[in-house]
Amino acid sequence: MGAKEEYLENLKSFWPQNAPDISQVSKYVNKYKKEKIVIKCGGKVLIDPDLFDKFIEDVSVLHKLGLKVIIIHGGGPKIKTELAKLNIESEFINGLRVTDKKTMEVVEKALVDFNAEIVEKLSKKICKAEGLNVSTNNTIIVEQENKNLGFVGRPKKILNEKIQVVIDKHAIPVLSPMGKDDDSQKYNINADTAAAAVAKSLKSRRLLLMTDVEGVYDENKKLINEINPNEAKKLIDKKIVQGGMIPKLLNSIDAIENGVRGVVIIDGRKLHSILYEIFSDEGAGTLIRK
């Protein structure tokens, strides 16, 4: 058996069903093996057990192929459920959750618990991972976004060395979207904003933002496969995109203009969307790049 055949046989041992064509994988591995890939996990993936399991499986495949993956997870649906139990209603301004002290306590617990769950699930896939959260190992230095939003922070600095220590252990860093300011006050961060800040700081090759839609739509409600930052700005200016997609696009544009080669807003509801985005020309959403 030749080296190529042996490689494929090994790959088949962990390559999922209904994933992209296995014969094309090696060329994409060569493309990404020296790069970093930041993945923001959010939306329905967080609450649908099957989608969550597929997400964990996809990440473990990337790891087993030797790719450097960094995960930033959201917690919107879980936070919403916990707040509802306590009869706490959330207000949103431009897609960002207004966070008072009581809300902050709920947000922190939900995010820390979910962080631990992701690490545990990955370990069961024989995939070493390490949680980096605001309670035990803060990685994001923030400043307050604005007073109207309460305890919502904007990333000011990413402590790259903490992330690199985990990568050097051949483990996956799993980050919660929270940070501390210079006075150690904790702040909630929009998960897309946190992911973009990490991707910029690490100069990652790709940033994948998982959503509950196919990607970005044009004025005719058709999926846009690829778009550049200027075209993305026009979609916002013309109010073609609204709600939670606005911060996603703004963060994507910011990331592209600060060293990230490509940002993909991908459909997290599609099975193995991460593998289709990384290992095929088919993709799984909207690619934003220059």
Question: Where are these predicted regions, by residue range?
Answer:
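Nucleotide/pyrophosphate-binding catalytic subdomain
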Residues: M1-R269, Y276, E282, R289-K290
